[in-house]
């Protein structure tokens, strides 16, 4: 039988094992953060304010009940020098990877940070459900911080229980690995562990609580330090009245900044002997990485639902997968967080929110930066973002040989057509590689007809567009604003969110039009829009071959670039939901199937290049199951309903009709 090498008490004690250590037990920990930054050594139990520290030690583990491995990511484990076989052969793996048993060399702790949440400073937040284990040196893959999400109460748990449930853990596990496979900087997820411990949750915010399984994700990143890590030094906020737990401790702020630059931006440290110059170069690099990151999000239709400063990585990673979503139909106003009633973190708002968060980071760094120079760097953000964005979009359209002034307008017009036709974002881009090269004089309509037919299959029906255009504002609130616009225009102009009202009115206008349009008429409009755009796209493609005779090479390059930048698979909500429902019944096979597809988002196949015998048969069976699962299809009808509310679409009511033209007048809108 397996001997038990580690005894857990409070404080945690470690005894030398007489057994041969497993691969997990041989991980080489360095734990630099705890050596270089102030650590709270208090043994006071429970949540509390933690001044003058960047971390708090976790003195007692809170084991899960009968933890068991649900899924492993071989590619994430490889970053630690581990294989899935190593982990599965370790009888204590589930305990180690859920924070139920301390790994040799690890030093459990929780990170202290603050944050601006939905635009307001929230004071001390911190790792309320996350336990830092340490930093592992893995040779060729460098150093990785590892932590367990869902490990129990920490000093930063506030009113929470420190647990994560199976539902949210599956989503984080799959999305972490999906983003990495897409080539987007992200934290990684090495394992998903579930258990027989249950907690009470209200998943629909309906007042109805249910019992859900506690689960844990082992996360990896070069660092989990975030913008909010520097906000613990913030003085009292004039609006919220809150302050950071280490307000005024400029010495610790300098220590944290030095640590981040030395460990994660060593090139900047080496290039600058002057501290202020070094810090400005650091801030510029953080700005650049953030701009590039959000550009990558936008180009795969990803939306981060809680884009607060505490969820912004200081090293430019996608961090903390709470509410998130990959768009199905393209909608610039797409909101993936049911709590985001005002759309602060909508798809189209994400770049400007990232810039806003960078401004809060500059404030937090204070005298470490030159204020005027920091503002100048912030002013470069949108141009930097737009350059990265257009560069990626050119690749998605196969425009790789030339950069034309018209390209930006071509992309904007494409998105406009996708929006008004309700086209599926991922599948439409994937189909554009089938647009024929403009090399003969045949009729445009005849030439592009087949690909237009394929794209039309990805467009929305009238009923789907009605759902899309339903006003997101509560009916009573909208009625009050509409009434105010008619009875007191001056108060309306002062008190209301004119932009938000205009967006709601635009939805009402589109909804009204849809009730006057039948499906056949809609399809004709959609076809005409796509034929017109594809005609413009082919004219632009023709410019790619100016000055060269090797048309075959150009075509080959175009297809190669497009197929490596337009994924076939993304983590759609229904894919995650199917995996969740199966897992809640004890079947983890769907998580593993989804992971296998998401690991190769640009590929039509999923297995190794060659396999023999039994492995080949298993791989073929797995590929057949993945193909049948239809991960590259539009979402099924049930998935197109809002996950939080049952949407019943009716024609615009009399109240909306009565005030529609009055408010259009006062907001300057027309349809």
Please describe what each predicted stretch is.
Residues 169, 199-202, 206-304, 315-423, ...:
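ATP-dependent phospho-/nucleotidyl transfer catalytic cores
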């Amino acid at each position: 039988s397996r001997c038990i090498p580690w005894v857990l008490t409070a404080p945690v004690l470690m005894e030398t094992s007489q057994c041969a250590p497993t691969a997990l037990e041989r991980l080489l920990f360095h734990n630099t953060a705890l050596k270089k930054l102030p650590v709270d050594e208090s043994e006071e139990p429970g949540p509390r304010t933690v001044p003058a520290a960047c971390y708090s030690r976790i003195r007692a583990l809170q084991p899960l009940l009968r933890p068991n491995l649900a899924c492993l990511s071989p590619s994430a484990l490889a970053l630690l020098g581990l294989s899935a076989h190593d982990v599965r052969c370790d009888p204590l793996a589930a305990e180690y990877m859920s924070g139920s048993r301390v790994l040799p060399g690890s030093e459990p702790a929780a990170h202290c940070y603050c944050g601006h949440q939905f635009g307001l400073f929230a004071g001390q937040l911190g790792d309320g459900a996350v336990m830092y284990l340490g930093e592992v040196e893995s040779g060729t893959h460098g150093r990785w911080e590892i932590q367990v999400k869902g490990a129990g109460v920490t000093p930063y748990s506030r009113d929470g229980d420190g647990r994560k449930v199976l539902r949210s853990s599956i989503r984080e596990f799959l999305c972490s690995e999906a983003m990495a496979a897409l080539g987007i900087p992200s934290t990684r997820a090495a394992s998903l562990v579930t258990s027989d411990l249950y907690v009470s949750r209200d998943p629909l915010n309906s007042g109805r609580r249910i019992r859900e399984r506690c689960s844990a994700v082992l996360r990896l990143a070069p660092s989990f330090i975030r913008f909010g890590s520097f906000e613990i030094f913030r003085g009292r906020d004039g609006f919220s009245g809150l302050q950071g737990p280490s307000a005024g401790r400029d010495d610790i702020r300098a220590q944290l900044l030095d640590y981040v630059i030395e460990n994660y931006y060593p090139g900047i440290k080496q290039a600058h002997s002057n501290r202020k110059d070094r810090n400005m170069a650091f801030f510029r690099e953080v700005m650049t990485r953030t701009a590039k990151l959000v550009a990558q999000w936008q180009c795969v239709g990803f939306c981060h639902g809680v884009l607060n400063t505490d969820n912004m990585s200081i090293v430019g990673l996608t961090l903390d997968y709470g509410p998130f979503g990959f768009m199905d139909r393209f909608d610039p106003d797409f909101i993936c967080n049911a709590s985001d009633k005002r759309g602060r973190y909508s798809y189209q708002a994400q770049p400007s929110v990232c810039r806003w968060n960078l401004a809060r980071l500059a404030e937090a760094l204070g005298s470490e930066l030159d204020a005027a120079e920091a503002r100048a760097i912030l002013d470069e953000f949108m141009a930097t973002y737009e350059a990265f964005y257009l560069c990626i979009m050119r690749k998605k359209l196969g425009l790789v040989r030339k950069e034309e002034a018209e390209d930006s307008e071509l992309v904007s017009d494409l998105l406009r057509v996708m929006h008004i036709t309700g086209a599926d974002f991922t599948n439409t881009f994937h189909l554009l590689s089938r647009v024929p090269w403009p090399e003969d004089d045949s009729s445009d309509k005849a030439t592009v007809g087949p690909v237009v037919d394929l794209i039309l299959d990805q467009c929305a029906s009238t009923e789907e567009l009605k759902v899309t255009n339903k006003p997101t504002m509560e009916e009573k609130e909208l009625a009050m604003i509409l009434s105010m616009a008619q009875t007191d225009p001056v108060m309306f102009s002062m008190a209301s969110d004119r932009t938000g009202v205009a967006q709601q009115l635009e939805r009402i206008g589109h909804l009204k039009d849809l009730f006057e349009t039948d499906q056949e008429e809609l399809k004709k409009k959609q076809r005409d829009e796509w034929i017109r755009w594809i005609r413009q796209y082919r004219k632009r493609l023709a410019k790619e071959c100016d000055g060269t005779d090797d048309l075959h090479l150009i075509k080959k390059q175009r297809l190669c670039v497009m197929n490596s930048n337009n994924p076939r698979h993304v983590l759609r909500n229904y894919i995650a939901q199917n995996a969740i429902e199966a897992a809640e019944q004890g079947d983890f096979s769907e998580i593993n199937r989804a992971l296998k597809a998401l690991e190769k988002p640009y590929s039509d196949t999923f297995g190794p290049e060659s396999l023999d015998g039994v492995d080949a048969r298993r791989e073929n069976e797995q590929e057949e199951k993945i193909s049948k699962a239809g991960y590259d299809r539009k979402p099924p009808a049930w998935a197109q309903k809002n996950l939080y509310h049952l949407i019943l679409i009716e024609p615009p009511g009399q109240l909306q009709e009565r005030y529609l033209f009055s408010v259009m007048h006062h907001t300057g809108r027309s349809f």
